[in-house]
Every structure is written in C-alpha cells, then in structure tokens.
Regions:
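Active-site/ligand-binding loops adjacent to catalytic centers
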Residues: 1-33, 75-159, 201-224
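Glycine-rich ThDP/TPP pyrophosphate-binding loop and its adjacent helix/strand module
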Residues: 39, 45, 49-71
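Short glycine/threonine-rich catalytic loop with a Thr-x-Gly-x-Asp
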Residues: 60-64, 122, 156-164
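Beta-strand segments within the central parallel beta-sheet cores of soluble alpha/beta enzyme folds
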Residues: 54-56, 83-92, 182-187
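A structured beta-alpha segment of the ubiquitous adenosine-cofactor-binding alpha/beta core
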Residues: 27-50, 77
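Short glycine/serine/threonine-rich phosphate/pyrophosphate-binding segments
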Residues: 35, 62-69, 96-100, 163-171
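Catalytic phosphate/nucleotide-handling subdomain of diverse soluble enzymes
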Residues: 168-224
C-alpha cells in the first residue's frame, strides 16, 4: 500500500500517469472492465425484487456506481428480465458535490471519505444516467449523513461506511416526493470497517467512558 499526498483527485491523476508509463493496470472505475462487473449489481436487484425499483438511491463520488447500475438496469430490461427502469437518484456530500453544483470542486471536504471527490471521472456518464432516467442529483450534509449512519446501525444492525449512508440520508431528505406504493432501493457501497474512526467519534459518551459494572445498568442500556 502506497500513500500519496493530497486528495483523491490528485492521487488518481498520479496513478493514471503511472499506469500509462509502466506495466500497471488501473482498476479504478475509469477502467471500463470494472463497470462491466459493477453493473451486475443491478441484475441482482431485479432478481431479488422481480422488477426494477421505482427509485435507485446511490452515493456518488467518482460516479462509477451510478454509471454501472444504469448500464445494468438497461441491459437487463433489453434482455426481458424487467419491464421498467428506475429513476437514478444520486447523492453527494455537500462539501464534495461537483455534479450538484455543475463544476469541479478543487478542495472537496466531507466526513464521507469514499465520496470526497471533486472531479469524478465518470461525470458525463452520470449526467447521462440522470437525464435518461429522469433522475436527480442532490447534496446531503455531513450531519445528515451521520444521522442516517446511526439510523442504519441502530435500526437495521448495518455497519456501513459514512459514504454509504448518503443514499439513505438522501432518501430521507426526498421522502415527500416518493410516490405512494413505490419501491425504493438504497445502495450501501462500503463496510463500516473502512472508516471505523467515524463510529468511535460519533457515538455517545457511554461508548467512550464505559458503563458502570452493574447488571441493572447494563441490562437497561441493552433494552431489558
């Protein structure tokens, strides 16, 4: 593992140059073969539901996932496995929202490290997915991301990385627009162990200081 100084965009530009000059394969989503693999997640969604969802909510950083999912839904529909296509709803962190703002963000900043990207390499494909699906891009704040992050942990027992929670934060923000009876899928893109410090820093004081070594106290916190 090699650490490169600067942000994601600078690091990606560097490794692209390295890959162009040396016998190295870049497996970032700039690589079309990666998208071909990622698109199969859309197949799995349709297989699980029996049809494409009405909305597909997804975090957007480098925009590879939203590009790949849209590819997958279209291919599966053409193959006769579904009758409809979802609205592609992409959510970016407010401090790193180039697709929402319409321009590159030179110094992206967000707690959601996986989408802390100011110049997504798949931006044109993502814009196409939004346009073709009648979808939308929207920014969510770090506070909204953390709220959704905690909700997923406490309500669903899912420990995801902060970037993943952006899809749920976005759905919460847009919930009034969801048609009655609609099927909505939120994609969680990464495990919480990718960014465990967020769980520690954003937990309540009981996690930091510990509970008194008392059976009743511990049982109460556990909900008994």
């Amino acid at each position: 593992v090699i650490a490169i100084q600067g942000n994601f965009d600078r690091a990606l530009a560097t490794v692209q140059e390295v890959a162009n000059q040396y016998p190295i394969t870049l497996v970032n989503s700039v690589n079309p073969y990666r998208l071909e693999g990622q698109k199969t997640a859309a197949f799995e969604v349709v297989d699980a539901l029996g049809e494409a969802p009405d909305w597909l909510c997804i975090p957007v950083g480098n925009a590879g996932n939203i590009t790949a999912y849209w590819m997958g839904f279209n291919e599966y529909k053409r193959a006769g496995h579904s009758r409809c296509l979802p609205r592609m709803m992409g959510f970016q962190a407010a401090g790193s929202a180039p697709l929402v703002l319409g321009h590159t963000v030179e110094q992206p900043d967000t707690i959601a490290t996986a989408i802390r990207i100011g110049n997504p390499v798949n931006k044109e494909n993502a814009l196409k997915a939004r346009s073709e699906s009648n979808g939308d891009f929207m920014a969510v704040t770090d506070a909204e991301i953390i709220e959704a992050y905690k909700l997923l942990g406490s309500g669903e027992g899912v420990f995801c990385e902060p970037a993943s929670a952006a899809s749920v934060a976005g759905l919460i923000k847009r919930r009034a627009e969801v048609p009655a009876g609609a099927t909505v899928v939120c994609v969680l893109t990464g495990n919480g162990l990718k960014d465990p410090s967020t769980a520690i820093e954003n937990n309540d004081s009981r996690f930091h200081t510990g509970l008194a070594p008392d059976t009743d106290v511990v049982a109460k916190v556990m909900g008994f």
